[in-house]
């Protein structure tokens, strides 16, 4: 028999699920799974949210849902697919730059999310979600610096060179997917010229945009394990609606444990 707390959590979950559908302006499928990351399948229109061991705050729930709805509204499947067919190693770079664009657009569209996003990122920082507690942030790659600065802002103390600041400003200025792709390619080329990365590098895990119909591992060192298609998830998933769908193209967020 469900406890009052469990019933309250289920009610909140259902309310947030319905809100996500309304925000996305379409009948997307919302599921809850025992997975380490949240993702949105932009091909099959499925939003999956992890089931945390502890209760998820309303603000964190809003961040997860708001971010994924941002991809539902603004990230083009064909654009992502084409870019990765051309160069698979762009995955991490495309993800970070696109996150900047869609989070800005979803906050502009739904101004009430601004406060939730701010509080949720505070919560993530308090739980060392990005794994930076004992890191020298100045030694991070440019793409990881951009990922942190654009998500948590002044909560991290990272200094950029004039050249790096120009690139960051370009990320903030992206309005279209084509601009995202161009800036991601610029960062990728800059990194090849100015940085050394290998499989031992520990990048800061971004909220990742996935193409599940790609099976090969990413060889760029950009957190390969965060690029799976979600098909190996255990059957303990809880689905809030009866809609059908797979998980070919996803956006993921790492777990808080």
Question: What does each model-found stretch correspond to?
Answer:
Residues 1-257:
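Short, functionally important secondary-structure microenvironments
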């Amino acid at each position: 028999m469900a406890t009052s707390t469990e019933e309250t959590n289920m009610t909140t979950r259902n309310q947030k699920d319905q809100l996500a559908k309304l925000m996305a302006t379409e009948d997307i499928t919302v599921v809850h799974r025992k997975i380490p990351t949240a993702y949105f399948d932009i091909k099959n229109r499925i939003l999956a949210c992890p089931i945390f061991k502890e209760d998820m705050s309303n603000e964190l729930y809003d961040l997860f849902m708001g971010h994924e709805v941002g991809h539902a509204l603004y990230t083009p499947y064909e654009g992502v697919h084409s870019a990765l067919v051309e160069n698979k190693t762009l995955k991490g770079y495309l993800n970070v730059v696109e996150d900047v664009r869609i989070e800005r657009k979803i906050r502009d569209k739904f101004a009430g999310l601004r406060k939730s996003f701010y509080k949720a990122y505070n919560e993530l920082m308090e739980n060392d979600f990005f794994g930076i507690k004992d890191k020298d942030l100045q030694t991070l790659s440019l793409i990881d610096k951009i990922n942190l600065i654009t998500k948590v802002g002044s909560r991290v103390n990272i200094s950029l060179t004039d050249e790096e600041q120009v690139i960051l400003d370009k990320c903030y200025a992206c309005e279209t997917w084509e601009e995202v792709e161009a800036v991601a390619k610029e960062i990728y080329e800059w990194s090849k010229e100015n940085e050394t990365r290998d499989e031992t590098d520990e990048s800061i895990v971004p909220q990742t945009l996935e193409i599940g119909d790609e099976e090969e591992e990413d060889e760029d060192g950009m957190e390969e394990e965060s690029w799976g298609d979600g098909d190996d998830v255990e059957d303990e998933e809880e689905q809030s609606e009866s809609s059908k769908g797979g998980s070919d193209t996803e956006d993921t967020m790492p777990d808080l444990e």
